[in-house]
Amino acid sequence: MSMDIVERINKLKEEKNAVILAHNYQPKEIQKIADFLGDSLELCIKAKETDADIIVFCGVDFMGESAKILNPEKKVLMPEIEGTQCPMAHQLPPEIIKKYRELYPEAPLVVYVNTTAETKALADITCTSANADRVVNSLDADTVLFGPDNNLAYYVQKRTDKKVIAIPEGGGCYVHKKFTIDDLKRVKSKYPNAKVLIHPECSPELQDNADYIASTSGILRIVLESDDEEFIIGTEVGMINRLEIELEKLGKKKTLIPLRKDAICHEMKRITLEKIEKCLLEERYEIKLEKEIIEKAQKAIERMLRI
């Protein structure tokens, strides 16, 4: 009897001492076969801790790069590179950084991990949505440059006495920018008792009207630990898959309502089981970065991980 694709992937993983890391926004079938699921910070830490020879990263381009930066000696593969470029990660190129560095020469630059390796190499420190406020508050400066997500910068500004300068103007995630206050009113009218959980990449107006603002790992923790039964989830719809998987493991049932059903990151959905199998079989789409970029970007990420 021929093996099914999941069995074949598991066999290849074992043969090659490979590990599969998948972001919370990945399709459900990918989440189910991953060795580790998580948000950007959790996956950064897992990538650093793994003793596998090969890391297969199911996410978008900057995530694979981050895994390579933290594991320069390991082989980091992505099942797909065509169409997996996170648009926001490319909104803060070196020339924009140069302009703001000249305007604010004393201000440290904090960049979201949702950036390219080149951008991280120019930063003083990186952050994720799970630790952005802690990272900014750890810096010995009154003013910080923060990019590329303007909504995350707003979230941080509300939690620090420092002046946060959001760069570039209008930077952000196209998925989270879809959510509006009208969406919230519409869904809330149908589920008046539901708690509203949103990601800090959502607009200031939504942040000001949410019960909780959290990274995807924070959203998971709140849903699992809360006594509440209904939640409106304001982030990419793949997160609902992750929540359902974890609730099922605990034998719990809760009502999870997407703030918008079309909140889909198309770049995250490019990965399939077939592509993972081919990636392991051929060891294709390896992430390669210049040594100098790796060394500089590593300093910025390592500094974050020490906080």
Curated annotation (Swiss-Prot):
Iminosuccinate binds at residues 23, 40, 112-114, 129, 199-201, 216. SUPFAM superfamilies: NadA-like. Its cofactor is [4Fe-4S] cluster. It holds the Pfam family NadA. Its main location: cytoplasm. HAMAP family: NadA_type2. Catalyzes the condensation of iminoaspartate with dihydroxyacetone phosphate to form quinolinate. This is Quinolinate synthase.
